[in-house]
Amino acid sequence: MESERLERATRKWWFYLILVALLFLAPSYSSATGFITGEKNGEVVAEVLTYSLKPYKPFMPLLHIIVILFIAAVLVYGNRFGKIFTAFVGVNYLFIAFLQNTAVTERYGLGIITVNIIWFSLIGLLWLRDVKIRKTNYTFSRQPVWRYWVVPFAVLTFWSPDKPWDFNPIYLLTSDSPLAFCLITPTYLSIFYLLYLKVNLPALRVTSFIGTLLGISNIGIGFMRGVARAYT
């Protein structure tokens, strides 16, 4: 019954309107200034994202290897490893929620991106819930060639070259992707996309929506910064 309610809710427009509304209802926090709204909010977000993952840089090679091994295991063993993989994805998102979105900086003290913590925690909990209800079937069947268009993008975001056209293989072990939502999400979504209709649809919908929302936002911010530099 609960699963049916969630399934119906994630098909309604108002559910996603609530997720978007959290942008305004859950402002970022700084220990130096309190809760922040308006233009300052963007500054705090940028500052936190700049510094949040730096303490974990030494662990990135190990984290990359762990992610690769988990993906390889679910591709090889399917449902025999599916429950463990789903739990791993859920826990990964919970770690991302708090590690990527909190940082201590000289300018703002403790900075917290509140809305991201709420969004990413929701995603993590939805996938952890799937460990119990088992809505995802990791039986990988042969797909039409065109459906594999997601794979190159998944590899690219996991690789995450540090600079344009700098495809140094070392980034496959040193990038921030295991703890960065916008980098690891395309990797996970590519797997679930190939399982479409055999996957937990509420979890997939929410993950895809928030990922798309942040992706469009990041592209827009990057474009505006490029325009600003061109005219200064």
Language model: regions and residue ranges:
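Juxtamembrane membrane-water interface segments of multi-pass membrane proteins
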Residues: 1-9, 70-80, 131-144, 165-171, ...
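N-terminal topogenic module of multi-pass integral membrane proteins
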Residues: 1-109
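Alpha-helical transmembrane segments of multi-pass integral membrane proteins
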Residues: 14-28, 87-99, 115-133, 142-166, ...
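Juxtamembrane "helix-exit" motif on the non-cytosolic side of transmembrane helices
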Residues: 32, 98-108, 159-171, 217-229
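Short aromatic-rich membrane-water interface segments that cap or initiate transmembrane helices
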Residues: 44-59, 169-187
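Short, aromatic-rich membrane-interface segments at the entry and exit
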Residues: 60, 81-86, 109-112, 202-208, ...
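Non-cytosolic membrane-interface motifs at loop->transmembrane helix junctions
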Residues: 106-118, 140-142, 170-179, 228-232
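C-terminal transmembrane helix-loop-helix hairpin of multi-pass membrane proteins
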Residues: 173-232
